[in-house]
Amino acid sequence: MEKFNIKKLTKPFNIEIDSIASDKSISHRCAMFSLFSNQTSYIKNYLTAEDTLNTLSIVEQLGAKIKRDGSYVEITPTSTLTEPSDVLDCGNSGTAMRLFCGLLASVEGSFILTGDKYLRNRPMKRVADPLRSIGALIDGRENGNKAPLFIRGVKELKPFTYHSPVDSAQVKSAMILAALRANGISRYKENELTRDHTERMLNGMGATLEYDNDGFINIHPLNGHLKPLNITVPTDPSSAFFFAVAAAITSKSRVLIKNVTLNPTRVEAYQVLKRMGVIVNFIEKENVYEPIGDIEVINNELNGVDVSENISWLIDELPALSIAMSLAKGKSKVSNAKELRVKESDRISSVVNNLKLCKVDFTEFEDGYEIVGGSLQKAVIDSHGDHRIAMSFAIAGLNCDMDIEDIQCIETSFPNFKEILDSLY
């Protein structure tokens, strides 16, 4: 098992970073949505991490021709998707598995979606059940709740009106993809807006998705093929956030992160840092599918904060935020975050158990935790095979020495994380 030793940073840093991993959510969607076109899509700066390369591989198994040169990808789909001769391996990616459920539900053929041991333990009923209710044939372990999942595509899905009990961009996206091949207009609603890359990208490609006065997304079935993509994938704000926290916890430090998506549903964690006292500036430069620009983060005194709203907008950043909270003045509290229990690990448990090793005072709740800020102490951290836990506590190592066990998981989303971390010294 690979281990990562991080030494305390003894000097401030002032850097610009333009090599942070490309956005994972957008990269997944670029690969998948290209299948709705009948022309070649051109994707620059595609994320070349394990999860997104697995998605490219699945797209290829479904019949598309792929040319790749580093992070530049061309995808030429076939007129109809091909039934694969082998299982479709999503690796560690819940996004890939759940979105492919929606995409494949109405594709003629049989498909088996599987993944690594962590993904095979994550709940899939939240997406499989609503898809089944509109005619999809999906089965799996534990009464259809766990992968491997077996999908037999049906020719025509029923249009639906669905108010989701779970605020999840993955569930929403799966239902939207299924609705594109339904035999009428479908309506989808969530209680709290989740990240909206799917809606933005599909509308940009020519699909019709409209919000009505009742808060439903009205999804019109496709009449033909969508336009191909010609896109440069921006920097991932969730990956960039580790270095925002690095600046926030390191005295007199500053970081400028270049070419990030500034989508409001993706920068909420930066707004929380702002509320904690950190200086955060957003500099928008362009808007193609997504607003894109730079984010500047400057160290300032950290104060405790309560986080209970817009949780779906910062669910991936909460482990890193917990490091800032541990070094802030006063108490911080996270609530309404039960979704953390079913991520790559039980992230509430993973965060608080590792904070305990760092001698941080905390209280754990079913839907979050409270942290008494002050200091961190050196510890040997168990990542639980979760890339965000591994990277969050690696950033904590800038404040005090830290050893992280099982760091191979970082490759799933941010292959050059260690290289950028080393550049701070």
From Swiss-Prot:
Record flagged with keyword Ribosomal protein: no
Enzyme Commission (EC) number: 2.5.1.19
Record localization: Cytoplasm
One CC-aspect GO term: cytoplasm
Catalytic center residues: D316 (proton acceptor)
UniProt-annotated binding residues for phosphoenolpyruvate: K24, G94, R122, Q170, R347, R388
Annotated GO biological process: amino acid biosynthetic process; aromatic amino acid family biosynthetic process; chorismate biosynthetic process
SUPFAM superfamilies recorded: EPT/RTPC-like
Residues that bind 3-phosphoshikimate: K24, S25, R29, S168, Q170, D316, K343
Recorded metabolic or biological pathway in which this protein acts: Metabolic intermediate biosynthesis; chorismate biosynthesis; chorismate from D-erythrose 4-phosphate and phosphoenolpyruvate: step 6/7
GO molecular function annotations of the record: 3-phosphoshikimate 1-carboxyvinyltransferase activity
Alphabetical keyword list: Amino-acid biosynthesis, Aromatic amino acid biosynthesis, Cytoplasm, Transferase
Catalytic activity: 3-phosphoshikimate + phosphoenolpyruvate = 5-O-(1-carboxyvinyl)-3-phosphoshikimate + phosphate
Record-linked Pfam families: EPSP_synthase
Record has Transmembrane as a keyword: no
Major localization class: cytoplasm
Family in the record: Belongs to the EPSP synthase family.
Record note on quaternary structure: Monomer.
Described function: Catalyzes the transfer of the enolpyruvyl moiety of phosphoenolpyruvate (PEP) to the 5-hydroxyl of shikimate-3-phosphate (S3P) to produce enolpyruvyl shikimate-3-phosphate and inorganic phosphate.
Name of the molecule in the record: 3-phosphoshikimate 1-carboxyvinyltransferase
The organism of origin for this protein: Aliarcobacter butzleri (strain RM4018)
Gene name for this UniProt entry: aroA
